[in-house]
Amino acid sequence: MTHLRSRSGNVTHVMQGQLYISQTPGESLTCILGSCVAACVHDPALRIGGMNHFLLPGRDPHDTGSVRYGARSMEALIDALLHKGADRQRLNVWLFGGANVLGTQTGIGAANSAFAVDFTRAQGLTLRGSDLGGTRGRRVHFTPATGDPRVDYMQSDGIDDPIAGPLGAPGVELF
């Protein structure tokens, strides 16, 4: 995680495969998402919240406990909040990301989105809102103490942008 100070308070950038919780007034969490998903979870009575940022749906097939996978990431975030005194019945969840930013057919963004929604419902948590899917990346801002999320879309979806032009020159063979 990267912690920054600004005039408006502390900003913590939650990177892929990380999670962070806080109840510090003025602290803000942020992440940049493509096909990854972030859950922002908040207990309004305790004024505590957190954010995760997972890359892959489900469980780690090698059972390493990595929070890069949705199941472990979601469980770890909720457990950390409960450990600090949050009440599962009061937890509000917002889900973001899961885009198809590269225009490929892998479906990882859709799989991440479906996993996050299914997990939230299966755990009996309140899904307050979501902004999932599409073709554009997002920057998510979340204030854990107040539970206020905000999303900014990336400027270009990048799908129609060429990655590189043709390689080689007449008479040159590339291998």
From Swiss-Prot:
Reactions that this protein is recorded to catalyse: L-glutaminyl-[protein] + H2O = L-glutamyl-[protein] + NH4(+)
Family label: Belongs to the CheD family.
Q: Which GO terms describe its molecular function?
A: protein-glutamine glutaminase activity
Q: Which residues cross the membrane?
A: none
Which Gene3D superfamilies does the entry link to?
3.30.1330.200
Q: Which GO terms describe its biological process?
A: chemotaxis
> What domain of life is recorded for the organism?
Bacteria
Task: Specify the species.
Answer: Jannaschia sp. (strain CCS1)
Q: Which CDD domains match?
A: CheD
Q: What is this protein called?
A: Probable chemoreceptor glutamine deamidase CheD
Instruction: Write the Enzyme Commission number(s) for this entry.
Output: 3.5.1.44
What does it do? Answer: Probably deamidates glutamine residues to glutamate on methyl-accepting chemotaxis receptors (MCPs), playing an important role in chemotaxis.
- Gene that encodes it: cheD
The record ties this protein, via InterPro entries, to: CheD-like_sf (IPR038592), Chemorcpt_Glu_NH3ase_CheD (IPR005659), Cytotoxic_necrot_fac-like_cat (IPR011324)
Q: Which Pfam families match?
A: CheD
Q: Does the keyword Nuclease apply?
A: no
